[in-house]
Amino acid sequence: MASRGINKVILVGNLGNDPEIRYMPNGGAVANITIATSESWRDKATGEQREKTEWHRVVLFGKLAEVAGEYLRKGSQVYVEGQLQTRKWQDQSGQDRYSTEVVVQGFNGVMQMLGGRAQGGAPAMGGQQQQQGGWGQPQQPAQQQYNAPQQQQQAPQQPQQQYNEPPMDFDDDIPF
């Protein structure tokens, strides 16, 4: 089987501005956000602590865009999974311009809000949006990932939880 490659981007960072929301002619929502990721290290030559911040353009589509517009604000911590795409366009003077973005949409797109409540009163949704649990943690259906908090606070109709546990084939005769 020939491999075509993998185009997957995972980011955890903070929003640089409030999301910009617009709607396409078909009514679908589009949200543009900018996520800052930072790394720090100690400079070996000077011993100084150094930090570098990288800014990432992210575009969300559909229900994820609506959720981002309603609950994310500047400074919000967020986890996103998407694909890297480069667009080519022409500016007013006719020059070709390029813009590289992380596109979050469809089956491969994931957005999870992290951290506590934002200043604007948006509920913390990090723990409620786990798509897959680890060993001993429940696996929740993917569609719950997109539910707004109002829907989650309704009558507790939870699907029966399935647990993803490792097989229990321990050998008690191990000498250590």
Curated annotation (Swiss-Prot):
Keyword terms: DNA damage, DNA recombination, DNA repair, DNA replication, DNA-binding
InterPro entries: NA-bd_OB-fold (IPR012340), Primosome_PriB/ssb (IPR000424), ssDNA-bd (IPR011344)
SUPFAM superfamilies associated with the record: Nucleic acid-binding proteins (SSF50249)
Locus of motif Important for interaction with partner proteins: 171-176
NCBIfam families to which the protein is assigned, alphabetical: PRK09010.1, ssb
Sequence segments annotated as region (Disordered): 114-176
Cellular compartments per GO CC: nucleoid
Bias (Low complexity): 120-162
Biological processes annotated in GO: DNA recombination; DNA repair; DNA replication
Domain of life where this protein originates: Bacteria
Organism (species): Vibrio parahaemolyticus serotype O3:K6 (strain RIMD 2210633)
Protein name: Single-stranded DNA-binding protein
Molecular function as annotated in GO: single-stranded DNA binding
Function: Plays an important role in DNA replication, recombination and repair. Binds to ssDNA and to an array of partner proteins to recruit them to their sites of action during DNA metabolism.
Assembly notes: Homotetramer.
Residue ranges of every copy of the SSB domain listed in the record: 6-111
Known DNA-binding region: 55-61
